[in-house]
Amino acid sequence: MRAFLALEDGFVLEGRSFTGRGESGGEVIFNTGMTGYQEVLTDPSYAGQMVCMTYPLIGNYGVTAEDMESGKVHVEAFIVKECCRTPSNWRAIMSLPDYLAQHGVMGIEGIDTRALTRHLRINGAMRGIISTETDDRDELVRRARALPTMEGQNLVTRVAPATPYRWDGTRPQPVQLAADGAYAWPGTGPRLVVYDYGIKWNILRLLTDQGFDLLVVPPSFTAMQVAASGAEAVFLSNGPGDPATLTDEVREIRVMTERMPVAGICLGHQLLGHALGGTTHKLKFGHHGCNHPVKDLVTGHIEISSQNHGFCVDIESVPDVEITHVNLNDGTLEGFAHKTRPILAVQHHPEASPGPTDSRYFFARFRGMVREAVGR
């Protein structure tokens, strides 16, 4: 079915919908991963975005039950050069087109993804529309320009849970706190409150592997509630949108950083930066993919990392921290640790899913920091 992709600057490409009729809009970005499309689709950090995969053939291994990073598809639309309809994978439960159609998400193929990626790299990520409903290119460009920009958008409210839950190893399970806010921690490990701003499930798996006893909470959970729960440390997850909009969350994080160990990944890294007095800015086209080189300044090692962010903490803006990681492509901040308090964070994704596992030591580093701070 004939479909068009129109960007706000008037750049228009024609392709074919592989999920039926429809129209969708959002910020158009590109991802340089060769594999891992299922994890991309189910990553809540992609809310509000239409993702172009730079690799030319996507869908070869279908969709599996084991490779989800959340319970649904979060991208606004999926843009590929060619979509495979006959996957070859013994684990596959359905094809990529069927999966997107099941979740009501538009997919477009036949697009010159090299031309689109080059355009976005030169001109920056921008708003766009994909539609099968009209071939009026000027009208589609007008619709793209009417969409909200990513700056100023709080998208966490679209993907975060409303109530606390526990992680059973495969899926979230609801929990009930006592009237006074206390939580009956089921395990014997360090008691960790995990803020879910749009968390990827592999983060929960790896925190569990480190021996933490987890209570996962919504963004509205206050520092006072954290204390009442009996938590000993706090972890801030990834998530979508502009971190500068989350002023209430930053206020509560600031309180928690004065009381207990705190770590963050991606959006959590940005929120910690704000809580400690720093600022953030929007990157031209973001970092999206699983082949980004990062240098760990603590060890001197070079890591290939998985990344997905459109905003970045200004590298000189956060007081009283040691810069621990930098991006070797553009020199942007990839991680910091506080000089006197048990606080650390990274911008990239050490849990990967998809991507390399070079940075997975971050979870052990956090576990060691908590052990030193709380004595177990």
UniProtKB/Swiss-Prot annotation:
Pathway note: Amino-acid biosynthesis; L-arginine biosynthesis; carbamoyl phosphate from bicarbonate: step 1/1; Pyrimidine metabolism; UMP biosynthesis via de novo pathway; (S)-dihydroorotate from bicarbonate: step 1/3
Keyword check for Nucleotide-binding: yes
Catalytic residue positions: 266, 349, 351
UniProt keyword list: Amino-acid biosynthesis, Arginine biosynthesis, ATP-binding, Glutamine amidotransferase, Ligase, Nucleotide-binding, Pyrimidine biosynthesis
Entry similarity comment: Belongs to the CarA family.
Species per Swiss-Prot/TrEMBL record: Nitratidesulfovibrio vulgaris (strain DSM 19637 / Miyazaki F) (Desulfovibrio vulgaris)
InterPro entries cross-referenced by the UniProt entry: Anth_synth/Amidotransfase, CarbamoylP_synth_ssu, CarbamoylP_synth_ssu_N, CarbP_synth_ssu_N_sf, Class_I_gatase-like, CPSase_GATase1, GATASE
The enzyme's E.C. designation: 6.3.5.5
Binding site residues for L-glutamine: 45, 239, 241, 267, 270, 308, 310-311
Function: Small subunit of the glutamine-dependent carbamoyl phosphate synthetase (CPSase). CPSase catalyzes the formation of carbamoyl phosphate from the ammonia moiety of glutamine, carbonate, and phosphate donated by ATP, constituting the first step of 2 biosynthetic pathways, one leading to arginine and/or urea and the other to pyrimidine nucleotides. The small subunit (glutamine amidotransferase) binds and cleaves glutamine to supply the large subunit with the substrate ammonia.
Region (CPSase): 1-187
Pfam families in UniProt: CPSase_sm_chain, GATase
Upper lineage: Bacteria, Pseudomonadati, Thermodesulfobacteriota, Desulfovibrionia, Desulfovibrionales
Span of domain Glutamine amidotransferase type-1: 191-376
Catalyzed reactions per annotation: hydrogencarbonate + L-glutamine + 2 ATP + H2O = carbamoyl phosphate + L-glutamate + 2 ADP + phosphate + 2 H(+)
GO BP annotations, alphabetical order: 'de novo' pyrimidine nucleobase biosynthetic process; 'de novo' UMP biosynthetic process; glutamine metabolic process; L-arginine biosynthetic process
Self-association state and partner proteins as the record states: Composed of two chains; the small (or glutamine) chain promotes the hydrolysis of glutamine to ammonia, which is used by the large (or ammonia) chain to synthesize carbamoyl phosphate. Tetramer of heterodimers (alpha,beta)4.
Name of protein: Carbamoyl phosphate synthase small chain
An example Gene Ontology molecular-function term: glutaminase activity
Highest taxon above the source species: Bacteria
Top EC category: ligase
